[in-house]
Amino acid sequence: MLTKRIIACLDVTGGRVVKGVNFVGLRDAGDPVAVAARYNAQGADELAFLDITATSDERDLILPIIEAVASQVFIPLTVGGGVRTQADVRRLLNAGADKVSFNSAAIADPQVIDTASAKYGAQCIVVAIDARRRSAEESRRITAGGRAIGPGWDVYSHGGRRNTGLDALAWAVEMQRRGAGEILLTSMDRDGTRIGFDLELTRAVSDAVGLPVIASGGVGTLDHLADGIQTGGADAVLAASIFHYGEYTVGQAKQHLAGRGIAVRR
């Protein structure tokens, strides 16, 4: 039986780990190197390092911090935020990343996923999708086919600041076609709220693609992690708040998932 993964997430800005609610109201959560080492020791299956303001600030990759984090962890490390080109993938892999996550750059130029995947392999290429449920007004938006787009989720770029108008399910399918190896799916509506994943969104994307889907956004209890897998169909679950402030350890999370009948790496 394939085990399900628990991924600890470091949202980084200004050289510090932070956590907000709905992508705003950021609260400090510590030094990224120290936090990464803690999750490595706790037995996290993977670590995600996301520079959440690199794109909006038009800033370069923070390679020294990434290298320092990579030196402290012996689990797969995914790095995202400010990744724009195939050359950036090479720079991050050389800095110690195992996978590289594209978001806004893939929206601006989807071909970058084709080229990066062809050169480095799909197993290295993650596409992050920040999705927000459409309002009633947005659901009436007319598509190129002349019909209302209807209920669903729009894809946002630039750290959740811009609505691209792309449909999240269609975008995930296109990213799979272009060579992505994994989808990191964040519900902007649930981010930091601690009320659980958007399970409808998670299930819809999981059913739409044949790729591993990482559920992100909204974890407040250990049951939420299990729900993301059992109800949402996710292959991995990502959390930040419940781990950052000492409420739970990764080990406790794995024990809880096992108690719910979910296979985890111990």
From Swiss-Prot:
Annotated S-S bridges: none
Substrates-to-products reaction catalysed: 5-[(5-phospho-1-deoxy-D-ribulos-1-ylimino)methylamino]-1-(5-phospho-beta-D-ribosyl)imidazole-4-carboxamide + L-glutamine = D-erythro-1-(imidazol-4-yl)glycerol 3-phosphate + 5-amino-1-(5-phospho-beta-D-ribosyl)imidazole-4-carboxamide + L-glutamate + H(+)
GO cellular component: cytoplasm
Primary localisation category: cytoplasm
Source taxon at top rank: Bacteria
GO molecular function terms listed in the Swiss-Prot or TrEMBL record: imidazoleglycerol-phosphate synthase activity; lyase activity
Similarity remark: Belongs to the HisA/HisF family.
Protein name in the entry: Imidazole glycerol phosphate synthase subunit HisF
Organism annotation: Verminephrobacter eiseniae (strain EF01-2)
